[in-house]
Amino acid sequence: MKIELVQLAGRDGDTAYNLSRTLNAIATCAGDTDLLVFPETYLSGFVGGAQLAQVAEPLHGTTLQTLLQAVRQRDVAVVLGFAEVHQGRFYNSSVLVTPEGIALQYRKTHLWPSERSDFSPGDRFTTVLWRGVRVGLLICYDIELPETSRALAQLGAEVVIVTNGNMDPYGPVHRTAIMARAQENQLFAVMVNRVGAGDDGLVFAGGSMAVDPFGRVLFEAGRDEVRHVVELDLDQLKAARRDYDYLKDRRLMLSGEQTEHPDGRRELLIGASQ
């Protein structure tokens, strides 16, 4: 599987600009690319307050429909984030968009402190089978909580994709976390961060990474814009679990209702008390 990490700067609240950059990346990707990954809330940027209501869109809104058309034209898939509105609530969401449609939606379950006054947390973890590989999504702060990636591993994830919006001075935290999450679950982890300046004096830390099931770094970006393709050797999944398998050896299961849907999605619901 060939995955392009698309580490870009963006504009907060400027969906048209961010969408234009996204479409250009799709149009110019290599012909054998399977998947492009963009940063957290890349389409909308980071917004809050009254501005959030102006830029947030429903799951099947016009921006994602435009994105879907581009995905179909190139026969690739895309993972990226946006500010979602649903039934009057706002969510920090990421989606896996394939030529067949929106294959997977994930709402950030662990909100950063400054987000909690604007966004509602998601209530489930989800994986889906895509091109023979089971994929799960996480968003930024999620990866600092080991239970999030373990939930996806419990749902059979082989590749965890993280849309990231990590800023200074926390870059080293996510560098450590993404390697740990890959190694302790014996799966691939791909994290794509934003770069450049944001609103309110934020400076995004870059450092997008791809890590193999042994916790070894396959690629690590710097602090500038970059597009880089990594090819995942899926045989490494079996190799990492040959001598010991953490999921089989563990004695503690994560709680929550687990469901498998006819379309292949697997979900683990977070209990009301959690």
UniProtKB/Swiss-Prot annotation:
UniProt note: pH dependence: Optimum pH is 8.0. Stable from pH 6.0 to 9.0.
Regulation: Completely inhibited by p-chloromercuribenzoate, N-ethylmaleimide, MnSO(4), MnCl(2), CoCl(2), NiCl(2), CuSO(4), CuCl(2), ZnSO(4), ZnCl(2), AgNO(3), CdCl(2), HgCl(2) and PbCl(2). Partially inhibited by FeCl(3) and Fe(NH(4))(2)(SO(4))(2). Slightly enhanced by dithiothreitol. Unaffected by LiBr, H(2)BO(3), NaCl, MgSO(4), MgCl(2), AlCl(3), KCl, CaCl(2), CrCl(3), RbCl, Na(2)MoO(4), (NH(4))(6)Mo(7)O(24), CsCl and BaCl(2). Unaffected by the chelating agents o-phenanthroline, 8-hydroxyquinoline, enthylenediaminetetraacetic acid and alpha,alpha'-dipyridyl.
Keywords: Hydrolase
One GO MF term: hydrolase activity
Record domain CN hydrolase: where: 1-234
Keyword Hydrolase: yes
Reaction(s) this enzyme catalyzes, per UniProt: (R)-piperazine-2-carboxamide + H2O = (R)-piperazine-2-carboxylate + NH4(+); beta-alaninamide + H2O = beta-alanine + NH4(+)
Thermal properties of activity per the entry: Optimum temperature is 45 degrees Celsius, activity decreases rapidly above 45 degrees Celsius possibly due to instability at higher temperatures. Inactivated following 10 minutes incubation at 55 degrees Celsius, and only retains 2.6% of activity after 10 minutes incubation at 50 degrees Celsius.
Enzyme Commission code: 3.5.1.100
InterPro entries documented for this protein: C-N_Hydrolase (IPR003010), C-N_Hydrolase_sf (IPR036526), RamA-like (IPR044083)
Pfam families: CN_hydrolase
Keyword Membrane attached: no
Positions of the catalytic residues: 40, 108, 140
Subunit field text: Monomer.
Described function: Hydrolyzes (R)-piperazine-2-carboxamide and (R)-piperazine-2-tert-butylcarboxamide with strict R-stereoselectivity. Also active towards beta-alaninamide, piperidine-3-carboxmide, D-glutaminamide and slightly active towards L-glutaminamide and piperidine-4-carboxamide.
Protein name: (R)-stereoselective amidase
This protein's encoding gene: ramA
